Structures are given as C-alpha cells and as structure tokens.
From Swiss-Prot:
It catalyses: (4R,5S)-dethiobiotin + (sulfur carrier)-SH + 2 reduced [2Fe-2S]-[ferredoxin] + 2 S-adenosyl-L-methionine = (sulfur carrier)-H + biotin + 2 5'-deoxyadenosine + 2 L-methionine + 2 oxidized [2Fe-2S]-[ferredoxin]. Pathway: Cofactor biosynthesis; biotin biosynthesis; biotin from 7,8-diaminononanoate: step 2/2. The lineage of its organism: Bacteria, Pseudomonadati, Pseudomonadota, Alphaproteobacteria, Rickettsiales. Residues 37-264 form the Radical SAM core domain. GO terms for biological process: biotin biosynthetic process. Homodimer. It comes from the Bacteria. Keywords: 2Fe-2S, 4Fe-4S, Biotin biosynthesis, Iron, Iron-sulfur, Metal-binding, S-adenosyl-L-methionine, Transferase. One of its GO terms (molecular function) is 4 iron, 4 sulfur cluster binding. This is Biotin synthase. The keyword Transferase applies. PANTHER family: BIOTIN SYNTHASE, BIOTIN SYNTHASE, MITOCHONDRIAL. Binds 1 [4Fe-4S] cluster. The cluster is coordinated with 3 cysteines and an exchangeable S-adenosyl-L-methionine.
Length: 322
C-alpha cells in the first residue's frame, strides 16, 4: 500500500528489524510492485563541470573545495546527442544530464530544452539535474518533453546544516514541489556515509515518503570521499547499513525505482545482490558518473548475467504480482 503518512517511530522500527526479516519484508513488497529480476539502466553525463558556488561538503565540483577539478563550459546540443546515442547503443534506457551550478538560469533554458529534445529523438527517457528550478522553468522543460528532474535532499533536515549552508532544505523542497506541479516525474534521494546517524537516514526517507507524491526514482548514493573536500576522511558506510537503507526505502516507497547511484565502484557482487534482493531496481551504467568512478560496463554485464537479472525500460518492470 502506498502511504504518505509515515511516522518516525514506524521508520525506526523498520531500521531496527533483524536484517533477514527486513530483507524478506522488502523483497515481498518489491515483488508486489515490480518484476523482481529486472533493473532499469541509466546513464549520466556532465554538461557543465566545476565552479559551482554551493558549498556542499561532499562535492568535487564546488568552488569552495580544492579538488583540482578542471572546469568545463556548457555542452553543445550535438555533444549531448552524441552521448545519448552512445548510451543507447550499449543498452541504456534513460539518459540523465547534470550541470554544476546553483540554479538553472533563464538564459540557458532554451539550450536545455534542446538537450531534452535531442535525447527524446534518440528514443530515450530524459532526466535533468540542474539545481534549483522555478515553476515557469519547470513548465518549459515539461513542454520540451523532459521526463524526470533530479534534485536530492541529501540527508535529514536536522543534519543538513553540517553538509550545506548555501542552500536551505526548504529551497530543495520548493524545487521538488515546482517539478511536481509542472507534471515532471521527481527523482530525489540522498547520500549515505557523511557522518549521519540511523535516525538521520530514517528522517531523510520519511521526508521523501511523505511528499504529496512519492519520487518516481529514489537514488541512494554511497559517499565518494574526494580529496580536497571536507569529507575526504569520512568513514565508509557499513555495507549492512547501506542495504538496510535500500530495504526501508523499498518498503516506504513501494512503487518507486530505488537506484544504486554513486559509490558502486567498490561494491562487491555479493553486496549488489543483497541490494537487488532488498528492492534496488535501477543502476547507472558507464565507467564515469559526473566526476566519480562507476562500476565498469563489463562488471555490470557479468553481474547481471550471473544473477539472472535483465535490463529493461521503465514501465516494463511494473505491476507484477509474482
């Protein structure tokens, strides 16, 4: 059952279940809403790199962090079209693109709309991650055919000030509301391993699950600790705790795609398998995610083959009582 009235007590109870009980519960929910041996495969391109004015502690592209990243200006339409075509050729179904800036500028809206149209012409779903978005901008992107907009909450409201101070939590929620009001599917999740507590993870999922409409996609990232960022020495999130979060996300948002996003490059096959069993059913494909390494295509092909999991487009997975 899809709910928007979860409580913190209920959420913490899920996190506190014995591991096997939690995974069993999540897996049964997953089977109710999705075909359980299928995953959605997405690609992610960086259309503008570095120099972002936000001070996100985890980000290699923040102008506040000394990571040595080379800046790159806004891509051309043909560059985006070529990247989308290459992604389609290797089996990707959704092409996502992101820009390192605080918000979408009005002067760039037309160019972004051209990106969306180019991606759609290749027969792919489109997703943009461009920072804060005004309602009228969201409406223009919807008219251009944008399918998804990504804007993560990153962590809980209570812990957020430890991670970002140049953008408020409410500003993030305002953008999500604008995207939903424009009729675009929301992609919204967070990052694990930034020093947050289990309650912070619960609060983050609670925020997402109690939106007026659940995000269509929920990316769960494992922190990639870049040298030169305030979080470069952060301790890696425990694997069992990561899988727990995947499972709780699946239970609380049963019809959403739960995506394994950044931080997969050092995940074992066994950890991937547990995540898929717990309800993860979407991955990013390709060796690079913005500025972070990703699992190689060869690793993913071998992994999915060994597990008997197949890559299928969005919508093909759904409503399977099996």
């Amino acid at each position: 059952m899809i709910r928007n009235n979860w409580t913190l007590e209920e959420t913490l109870e899920l996190f506190g279940l014995p591991f096997n009980d939690l995974l069993f519960k999540a897996h049964m929910v997953h089977r109710e809403y999705f075909r359980h041996n299928e995953v959605q495969v997405c690609a992610l391109a960086n259309i503008k790199a570095g120099g972002c004015p936000e001070n996100c502690c985890y980000c290699s592209q923040s102008a506040h962090n000394k990571t040595g990243l080379t800046k790159k200006g806004l891509s051309s339409v043909e560059e985006v079209r070529t990247a989308a075509r290459r992604a389609k050729d290797v089996g990707v179904h959704r092409f996502c693109f992101a820009a390192a800036w605080r918000n979408l500028h009005d002067r760039d809206v037309d160019r972004i709309c051209e990106f969306v149209k180019a991606i759609k012409e290749e027969g792919l779903e489109s997703c943009a991650s461009l920072g804060m978005l005004k309602l009228e901008q969201a409406q223009k992107l919807k008219e251009a055919g944008l399918d998804f907009y990504n804007h993560n909450v990153d962590t809980s409201r209570a812990y957020y000030h430890n991670i970002v101070t140049t953008r408020t939590y409410d500003e993030r929620l305002d953008t999500i509301n604008n995207v939903q009001e424009a009729g675009i599917n929301v992609c919204c999740g967070g990052i694990l391993g930034m020093g947050e507590s289990t309650e912070d993870r619960a609060q983050m999922l609670l925020t997402l699950a109690n939106l007026k409409q659940h995000p269509r996609s929920v990316p769960i990232n494992r922190l990639v600790a870049f040298k030169g960022t305030p979080l470069e020495g952060a301790k890696k999130v425990n694997s069992v705790d990561f899988v727990r979060t995947i499972a709780v996300a699946r239970i609380m948002m049963p019809a959403s795609y739960v995506r394994l996003a950044a931080g997969r490059s050092d995940m074992t096959e066994e950890m991937h398998a547990l995540c898929f069993f717990a309800g993860a059913n979407s991955i990013f494909y390709g060796e690079q995610l913005l500025t972070t390494e990703n699992a190689t295509p060869e690793f993913d092909q071998n992994l999915l083959s060994r597990l008997g999991v197949v890559a299928t487009p969005s919508g093909a997975h759904e409503s399977c009582a099996c």
